[in-house]
């Protein structure tokens, strides 16, 4: 959520920043509601003071011997009752204005940092660096979905029978390979200082509102009809909300969390795109990284977050590039974001496998997540960061293509081998599909 004081003090600056994102926002209405609410608050406080004064006056008169049922005391009590009724009306109207204002504020995306490149869409993102050789192979490379089915790593038709389209079932060596990837990712991140969490896979509406998925992206999520619970679209939601409505001692910052979870997305706007394979599914596996930091640390922690995600791609020997997202391509909650895009030889292009975002205090304001400096009064909002470390299905898909050998076998990268059962690993380091 944006700082309301910033909107009051520098509305044009906020308007220009939102325009860079291509966001449509009724700032004038928000400021109008805020102004009316503050006027009512001023009036209510004055009436409350008057009511308190009347109460004291009545008490004083009675102590001085006035008749409690007399005309003077009765008139003052009636005046006090009228004031209380007016105060109650003002409080009700204040709540209505506050509710409408908060509803509008929740629809506003985060403001991009001044350093973010200005652009309209992904075509204007800026490449930062590359790693590995993204070369067109000298031998034919099957798309990952074809080689996976050929090797018996996944079941598509039977998964669709159990659920619907955009679901798959990993089986045999495919399941073992996915499990090995998850274990490798978690072990690397734990070694880098992250605390592993197994969070709830169902969260309430307040949690989704805290990280910015609600109200804007309700149509993208799966909801349990009889409960205020949603299947998580990413572990970012439960991890970031672990400390919601709490005050963290500043000396405990930064906090690092990692989690493996299944993730669930309706993909309502992706009809006809990536209909085969592991790229775009309703249910997919992901290892997520979340940081809760002091504001002075967040930019440095953002760069470390990107490096932590990059480390997995390097361990898997997968060519990739780092891209900074332009203003028009930023996620709703992000103030700055770097995407990691892994190379897919069959498509002759890079595809996103991780988004590493610095949300500044945007999510913290929505979740009321604060810190307190020792020996100082007051609290301040933390900064939150998140990134995929990595999307497991896409990592597996990229591995099947980039390490596909001329004979059709799949070479398992050295760093992954200790996590894969020897039943599925041949002596020359290739994936064995029939142990």
UniProtKB/Swiss-Prot annotation:
GO terms for molecular function: ATP binding; serine-tRNA ligase activity. Keywords: Aminoacyl-tRNA synthetase, ATP-binding, Cytoplasm, Ligase, Nucleotide-binding, Protein biosynthesis. The keyword Ribosomal protein does not apply. It comes from the Bacteria. ATP binds at residues 265-267, 352-355. Transmembrane segments: none annotated. GO terms for cellular component: cytoplasm. One of its GO terms (biological process) is selenocysteine biosynthetic process. L-serine binds at residues 234-236, 288, 388. Its main location: cytoplasm. Pfam families: Seryl_tRNA_N, tRNA-synt_2b. Consists of two distinct domains, a catalytic core and a N-terminal extension that is involved in tRNA binding. HAMAP family: Ser_tRNA_synth_type1 (MF_00176). Belongs to the class-II aminoacyl-tRNA synthetase family. Type-1 seryl-tRNA synthetase subfamily. This is Serine--tRNA ligase. It comes from Synechococcus sp. (strain JA-3-3Ab). The lineage of its organism: Bacteria, Bacillati, Cyanobacteriota, Cyanophyceae, Synechococcales.
């Amino acid at each position: 959520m944006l700082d309301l004081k910033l909107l009051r003090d520098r509305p044009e600056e906020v308007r220009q920043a939102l325009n860079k994102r291509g966001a449509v926002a009724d700032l004038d209405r928000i400021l109008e509601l805020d102004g009316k609410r503050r006027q009512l608050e001023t009036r209510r406080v004055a009436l409350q003071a008057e009511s308190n004064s009347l109460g004291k006056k009545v008490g004083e008169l009675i102590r001085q011997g006035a008749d409690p049922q007399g005309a003077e005391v009765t008139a003052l009590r009636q005046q006090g009752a009228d004031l209380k009724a007016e105060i109650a009306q003002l409080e009700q109207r204040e709540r209505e204005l506050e509710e409408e204002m908060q509803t509008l504020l929740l629809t506003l995306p985060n403001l991009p940092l001044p350093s973010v490149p200005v652009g309209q869409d992904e075509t204007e993102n800026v490449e930062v660096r590359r790693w590995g050789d993204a070369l067109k192979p000298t031998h034919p490379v099957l798309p990952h979905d074809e080689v996976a089915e050929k090797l018996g790593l996944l079941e598509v038709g039977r998964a669709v029978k159990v659920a619907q389209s955009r679901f798959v079932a990993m089986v045999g060596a495919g399941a073992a390979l996915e499990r090995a990837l998850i274990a490798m990712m978690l072990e690397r991140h734990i070694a880098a200082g992250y605390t592993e969490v197994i969070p709830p896979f169902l969260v309430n509406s307040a949690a989704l509102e805290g990280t910015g998925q609600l109200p804007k992206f309700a149509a993208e999520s799966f909801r349990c009809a009889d409960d205020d619970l949603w299947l998580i679209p990413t572990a970012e939601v439960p991890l970031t909300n672990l400390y919601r409505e709490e005050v963290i001692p500043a000396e405990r910052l930064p906090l690092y969390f990692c989690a493996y979870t299944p993730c669930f997305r309706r993909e309502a706007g992706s009809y006809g795109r990536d209909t085969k394979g592991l790229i775009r599914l309703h249910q997919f596996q992901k290892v997520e990284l979340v940081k809760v930091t002091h504001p002075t640390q967040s930019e440095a922690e953002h760069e470390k977050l990107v490096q932590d995600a990059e480390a997995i791609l390097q361990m898997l020997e997968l060519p990739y590039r780092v891209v900074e997202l332009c203003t028009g391509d930023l996620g709703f909650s992000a103030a700055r974001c770097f995407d990691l895009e892994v190379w897919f030889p069959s498509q002759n292009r890079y595809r996103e496998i991780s988004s590493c975002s610095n949300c500044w205090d945007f999510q913290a304001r929505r979740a009321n997540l604060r810190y307190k400096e020792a020996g100082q009064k007051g609290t301040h909002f933390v900064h939150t960061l998140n990134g995929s470390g990595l999307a497991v299905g896409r990592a597996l898909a990229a591995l099947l293509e980039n390490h596909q050998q001329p004979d059709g076998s799949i070479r398992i990268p050295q760093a992954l081998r200790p996590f894969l059962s020897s039943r599925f690993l041949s002596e020359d380091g290739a994936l064995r599909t029939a142990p």
